[in-house]
Amino acid sequence: METMRDIKRRINSIKNTQKITKAMKMVAAAKLKKAQLKAENARPFFEKTRSILIDVARRTRQKDIHPLLREKENNRSLFVMITADRGLCGAYNARVIDRVKKLTEKEDEVNFLAVGRKGRDFFGKRGYNIISEYINIDDYPDYSLAGKIGEEIISLFLDDVVDRVVLVYTYFNSAISQEVRDLTLLPLTPPDDKNQEEGKINTEYLYEPSPEAVMDILLPSYIKNILYSALIEAKASEFGARMTAMDAATDNAGELIDKLTLSYNRARQAAITKEITEIVGGAEALK
């Protein structure tokens, strides 16, 4: 049975931990606000690029296929996975890793481009080929990082090092809801024209010097836009997951402190009762 001193030591230790988790929750909440704003501001730009790609792809569909759209015969896959550099964010990293494990089960040859330390460490320690890694990512990634990653995977695809590129990341819905998503980056499949299916009128654009020339610039840009969107969505999701996890940890610490305080008070009451009983017993013996 624990002594009063042991219980008191545990209470103080948990209180110190609670201070840390509460501080981490507040920091994550502050970072989340800015990251969420960046993610929401980037979505309209991404959607506009997407709509232009739909229109250009529709005009060039009957012509020579672009190298970034061409499917290959082999099955050498590159998985671009975005995880966090640190833990203490609930199941955020585990969900991404689980999705990647499921996607790679039936792959012939698997390679990784790891964004974030946690994903790199998990698959690197298990003998997988990490072609490239990006760690110590800023809290608010800029477009240059997406551009660098985009150039690398486009080069790997065009040089026939890999035949398919799959992106796995976490989409931010809210502070308590994040969704792991995966999509094939290369060969790139132009998104469907949903407006056309619904009978809506599309704006006609004139592309100079030609739709094909625009496609040469637009496709790499579209890939980089997807990556940038994924990076900032993932960061917002990480902060949301960490804030939620630290909030739960703070609450759990409070509950444990209450239980231990109750145990301490009971032990103290028992000790006082025992001491009083001994005093009364001694007094009776002296009579």
UniProtKB/Swiss-Prot annotation:
PROSITE patterns per the UniProt record, alphabetical: ATPASE_GAMMA
Organism: Halothermothrix orenii (strain H 168 / OCM 544 / DSM 9562)
Record's subunit section: F-type ATPases have 2 components, CF(1) - the catalytic core - and CF(0) - the membrane proton channel. CF(1) has five subunits: alpha(3), beta(3), gamma(1), delta(1), epsilon(1). CF(0) has three main subunits: a, b and c.
SUPFAM superfamilies: ATP synthase (F1-ATPase), gamma subunit
Keyword Ubl conjugation listed: no
Membrane topology per record: Peripheral membrane protein
Protein name: ATP synthase gamma chain
Gene name tied to this protein: atpG
Stated family: Belongs to the ATPase gamma chain family.
Function: Produces ATP from ADP in the presence of a proton gradient across the membrane. The gamma chain is believed to be important in regulating ATPase activity and the flow of protons through the CF(0) complex.
UniProt-listed HAMAP family: ATP_synth_gamma_bact
Annotated GO CC locations: plasma membrane; proton-transporting ATP synthase complex
Keyword Ion transport recorded: yes
InterPro entries associated with the record: ATP_synth_F1_ATPase_gsu, ATP_synth_F1_gsu, ATP_synth_F1_gsu_CS
One record GO biological process: proton motive force-driven plasma membrane ATP synthesis
Single GO term (MF): ATP binding
Pfam families from the UniProt entry: ATP-synt (PF00231)
Superkingdom classification of source: Bacteria
